[in-house]
């Protein structure tokens, strides 16, 4: 962080002919670039990791032709999508058809500005950062709904209707699950929530909130349209859903938005339930000093990688659920459990159950 502060000071020093506002805008643009480029690279190579991991799980090799051991496969995929023609359905609303992927990718990137990667590594530190994530993150589904309607095609419309109903169902569940974390931390600031979990793995929220952690993880799979809950796309039912009529870069943007949201949900699970950037060995003799050299951002990335692997593991293991089963899971199982657990956490907070409350 000291290096970043020195860089900011250098920008102000080297631009004396700018007023403070222009220099501040320049800093914001630099921050945006340093966020978006690594995020897009991670998304691109997560697709490679997904194909490799699932390939090994299914006793296949996975991509291994483009570059050494297939490392250049994401670049080849990007070039292919960039050179493919964008085909518009005959009776589609072209302007809304093109707006839909933008509306899907913009929130998927915008939410990252409040994610704390370490104690002092973040784009901005909002006091209401969790509310910001929930509010901005929920906008992306309107891109999917708009894509289904603007395509003027029956399968995309069915996918859009499913997406709308799942949004109503699981945004409530996720909100209630994360409300229990807020009750423990006493704040909706993500930095404060992570700081409340310092002291070692015993202080992490997943221990007192284990049912909420499981519900959040499953709901995250559903919200991001991941197998076995990918009924919005459902190739065997609605042949791709909202993506049926999209090709070329418009399809690629939807693809990037989906994977960016997957990584976001993995990071959010780590921040809310697994101590964020904190080491699991804090307050443990010998181990704490042995791993004291590891930066906090490395711990956060390691935990996030584990959750991203769980995404792939679940996809390769379970068959797709029916749409009615997923809706029943929300309203008849998850919602009652989260409401009950809110009262349980409230009671434990009043009793000041150590060491979490």
Curated annotation (Swiss-Prot):
Which reaction equations make up its catalytic activity?
Answer: a quinone + NADH + 5 H(+)(in) = a quinol + NAD(+) + 4 H(+)(out)
Kindly give the Pfam families that the UniProt entry links to this protein.
NADHdh (PF00146)
Subcellular locations according to the entry: Cell inner membrane
Q: What is its main location?
A: membrane
Q: Which InterPro entries match?
A: NADH_UbQ_OxRdtase_su1/FPO, NADH_UbQ_OxRdtase_su1_CS
Q: Does the keyword Cell membrane apply?
A: yes
The residue ranges crossing the membrane are 25-45, 94-114, 130-150, 166-186, 201-221, 254-274, 294-314, 329-349
Q: Where does the source fall among the domains of life? A: Bacteria
Would the keyword Membrane turn up in this protein's UniProt record?
yes
Q: Check the record and name the PANTHER family matching this protein.
A: NADH DEHYDROGENASE SUBUNIT 1, NADH-UBIQUINONE OXIDOREDUCTASE CHAIN 1
Q: What does this protein do?
A: NDH-1 shuttles electrons from NADH, via FMN and iron-sulfur (Fe-S) centers, to quinones in the respiratory chain. The immediate electron acceptor for the enzyme in this species is believed to be ubiquinone. Couples the redox reaction to proton translocation (for every two electrons transferred, four hydrogen ions are translocated across the cytoplasmic membrane), and thus conserves the redox energy in a proton gradient. This subunit may bind ubiquinone.
Membership in a protein family: Belongs to the complex I subunit 1 family.
Give the record's subunit note.
NDH-1 is composed of 14 different subunits. Subunits NuoA, H, J, K, L, M, N constitute the membrane sector of the complex.
- The name under which this protein is listed is NADH-quinone oxidoreductase subunit H
The lineage, from the top, is: Bacteria, Pseudomonadati, Pseudomonadota, Gammaproteobacteria, Candidatus Pseudothioglobaceae
């Amino acid at each position: 962080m000291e290096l970043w502060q020195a860089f900011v000071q250098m920008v102000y020093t080297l631009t004396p002919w700018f007023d403070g506002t222009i220099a501040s805008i320049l800093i914001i643009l630099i921050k945006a670039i340093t966020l978006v480029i690594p995020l897009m690279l991670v998304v691109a190579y997560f697709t490679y990791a997904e194909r490799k991991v699932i390939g090994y799980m299914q006793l296949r090799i996975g991509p291994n032709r483009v570059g050494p051991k297939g490392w250049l496969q994401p670049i080849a995929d990007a070039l292919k999508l960039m050179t493919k023609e964008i085909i518009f359905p005959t009776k589609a609303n072209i302007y809304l058809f093109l707006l839909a992927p933008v509306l899907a990718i913009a929130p998927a990137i915008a939410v990252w500005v409040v994610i704390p990667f370490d104690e002092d590594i973040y784009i901005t530190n909002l006091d209401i950062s969790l509310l910001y994530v929930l509010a901005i993150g929920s906008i992306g589904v309107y891109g999917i709904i708009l894509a289904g309607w603007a395509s003027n095609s029956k399968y995309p419309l069915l996918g859009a209707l499913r997406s709308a109903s799942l949004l109503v169902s699981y945004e409530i569940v996720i909100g209630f699950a994360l409300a229990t974390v807020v009750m423990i931390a006493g704040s909706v600031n993500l930095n404060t929530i992570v700081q409340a979990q310092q002291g070692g793995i015993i202080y992490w929220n997943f221990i007192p909130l284990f049912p909420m952690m499981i519900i959040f993880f499953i709901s995250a799979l559903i919200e991001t349209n991941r197998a076995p809950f990918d009924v919005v796309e459902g190739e065997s039912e609605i042949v791709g859903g909202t993506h049926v009529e999209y090709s070329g870069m418009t399809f690629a943007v939807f693809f990037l938005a989906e994977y960016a949201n997957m990584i976001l949900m993995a990071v959010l699970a780590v921040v809310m339930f697994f101590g964020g950037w904190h080491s699991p060995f804090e307050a443990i003799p010998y181990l704490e000093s042995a791993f004291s050299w590891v930066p906090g951002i490395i711990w956060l990335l390691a935990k996030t990688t584990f959750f991203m692997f769980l995404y792939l593991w679940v996809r390769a293991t379970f068959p797709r659920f029916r749409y009615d089963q997923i809706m029943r899971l929300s309203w008849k199982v998850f919602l009652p459990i989260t409401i009950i657990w809110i009262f349980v956490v409230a009671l434990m907070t009043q009793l000041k159950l150590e060491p979490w409350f």
